[in-house]
């Protein structure tokens, strides 16, 4: 009864390239399991599509338009019972520049 709320680290990852995101998730989960912490995930969240509509011509032809889109892929990883060794290993982990990482304790 003493430890009702167990310690948890929640890691949110965002990237435009899903392959980079998946390899980063694998690295994080492997690091957590090597340091004897239990990892849940990666849990895929809905992908955000942002569509931009641009006129093709600089002057006339309003009917001629072009659409561009960016897709933001997101994942969540929960790490339960992290030791100081786990936190240190996660801080030293080298991840690609195209992946945005947000960590909550």
Swiss-Prot record:
Q: Which InterPro entries match?
A: Ribosomal_uS10, Ribosomal_uS10_CS, Ribosomal_uS10_dom, Ribosomal_uS10_dom_sf
Name this polypeptide is given: Small ribosomal subunit protein uS10
Name a single GO cellular component: ribosome
Q: Some GO term, biological process aspect, for this entry: which one?
A: translation
SUPFAM superfamilies xrefs: Ribosomal protein S10
- Residues passing through the membrane, by range: none
One of the entry's Gene Ontology molecular-function terms is: structural constituent of ribosome
Q: Does the keyword Ribosomal protein apply?
A: yes
Q: Partners and quaternary state? A: Part of the 30S ribosomal subunit.
**Cited function:** Involved in the binding of tRNA to the ribosomes.
The disulfide bridges present are none
Q: Which terms are listed as keywords in the entry?
A: Ribonucleoprotein, Ribosomal protein
Decide whether keyword Hydrolase is in the record. no
Q: Which organism is it from?
A: Cyanothece sp. (strain PCC 7425 / ATCC 29141)
Query: Entry's PROSITE patterns?
Result: RIBOSOMAL_S10
Q: Which family does it belong to?
A: Belongs to the universal ribosomal protein uS10 family.
């Amino acid at each position: 009864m003493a430890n009702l709320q167990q310690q948890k680290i929640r890691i949110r990852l965002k990237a435009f390239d899903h392959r980079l995101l998946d390899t980063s998730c694998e690295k994080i989960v492997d690091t957590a399991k090597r340091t004897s912490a239990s990892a849940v995930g990666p849990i895929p969240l809905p992908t955000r599509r942002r569509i931009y509509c641009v006129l093709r011509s600089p002057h006339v032809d309003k009917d001629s338009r072009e659409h561009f889109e960016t897709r933001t892929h997101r994942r969540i990883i929960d790490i339960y019972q992290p030791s100081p060794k786990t936190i240190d290993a996660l801080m030293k982990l080298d991840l690609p520049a195209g992946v945005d990482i947000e960590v909550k304790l």
